[in-house]
């Protein structure tokens, strides 16, 4: 079984069973409005991992996180309650069995699962497939591309991490340094430079560069104070714990990472193409020694870290390159 094949089937099945929230059932009308505004994918991610939409502000995010239990309870109260209709476990077992026997793939591949879901939607043999889409819900055929994109998000992260272009810890180190300088800037203090042993003014150029990447806007003082307040809030809620910026500011760290890889997109494309040549057993005479070794190392990391074999990697990476790394 290829990596993420079950994830694709499970995610599509969950999306097929979700219903839009009814804001009239909420005592907190603002929470009801936020819940009703969630797309099916956003609602699935909120239920599964407590992930809130990036498009929402800090106050909306907090209200939504605090109201997850109420959103779940509301969904259980309707006559046609959430989960009543949609793909059943039995139907998904049959679909996965069919996908595992797909003639175009040597294993249970995510692409085979997507193909079988598409065929299921075209057939319209089940009642839930004949539901009328509303506000993005019950759009079972439309969910296919959304699920594909979430799968490619995972493949993309695995591929980029496998290249070794930069270690994950580097983003944290940059953000740690940024927060240190912001904290001293707000307090009007100097920063101790461990290299020179001298107390120096906060690095305004570094702070401005990071803030540009984070989309801080023109009011940087407000942005900086918001960060420090968020850290203080985390410390109050988690007394005695070390503040983990990855938990407090996951989106900021993700933006730093995305910006780094955006600058290296062409290099990533070359590495991906070199890996595909290796998988196809094509001659690599035109590659430099360094490029050949990098492709080999990245392939081996994908095998060892993420459970790919040659066939499943060819399927996943080929799809990723075709959809996200076109020349």
What are these model-derived regions, one by one?
Residues 1-92:
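Conserved AAA+ ATPase small/helical "lid" subdomain
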Residues 89, 93-327:
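Terminal-proximal interaction/regulatory segments of ATP-powered molecular machines
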């Amino acid at each position: 079984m290829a990596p993420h094949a079950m994830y694709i089937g499970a995610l599509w099945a969950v999306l097929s069973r979700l219903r839009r929230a009814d804001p009239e059932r909420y005592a907190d009308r603002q929470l009801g409005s936020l819940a009703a505004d969630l797309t099916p994918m956003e609602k699935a991610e909120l239920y599964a991992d407590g992930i809130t939409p990036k498009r929402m502000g800090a106050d909306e995010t907090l209200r939504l996180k605090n109201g997850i239990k109420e959103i779940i309870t509301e969904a259980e109260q309707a006559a046609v309650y959430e989960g009543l209709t949609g793909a059943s476990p039995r139907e998904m077992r049959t679909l996965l069995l069919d996908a595992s026997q797909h003639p175009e793939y040597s294993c249970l591949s995510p692409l085979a699962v997507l193909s079988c879901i598409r065929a299921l939607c075209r057939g319209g043999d089940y009642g839930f497939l004949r539901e009328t889409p509303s506000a993005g819900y019950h759009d079972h055929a439309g969910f296919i591309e959304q699920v594909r994109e979430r799968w490619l998000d995972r493949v993309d992260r695995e591929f980029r991490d496998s290249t070794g272009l930069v270690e994950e810890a580097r983003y944290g180190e940059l953000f740690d340094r940024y927060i240190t300088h912001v904290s001293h800037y707000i307090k009007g203090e100097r920063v101790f430079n461990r290299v020179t042993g001298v107390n120096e003014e906060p690095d305004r150029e570094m702070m401005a560069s990071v803030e540009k990447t984070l989309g801080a806007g023109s009011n940087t003082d407000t942005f900086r104070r918001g960060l420090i307040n968020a850290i203080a809030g985390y410390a109050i809620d988690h007394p005695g714990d070390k503040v983990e910026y990855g938990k407090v500011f996951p989106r900021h760290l993700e933006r730093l990472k995305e910006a780094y890889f955006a600058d290296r997109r062409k290099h990533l494309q070359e590495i991906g193409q070199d890996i595909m040549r290796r998988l196809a057993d094509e001659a690599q005479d035109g590659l430099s020694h360094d490029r050949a070794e990098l492709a080999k190392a990245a392939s081996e990391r994908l095998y060892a870290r993420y459970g790919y074999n040659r066939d499943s990697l060819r399927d996943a990476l080929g799809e990723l390159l075709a959809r996200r790394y076109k020349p």
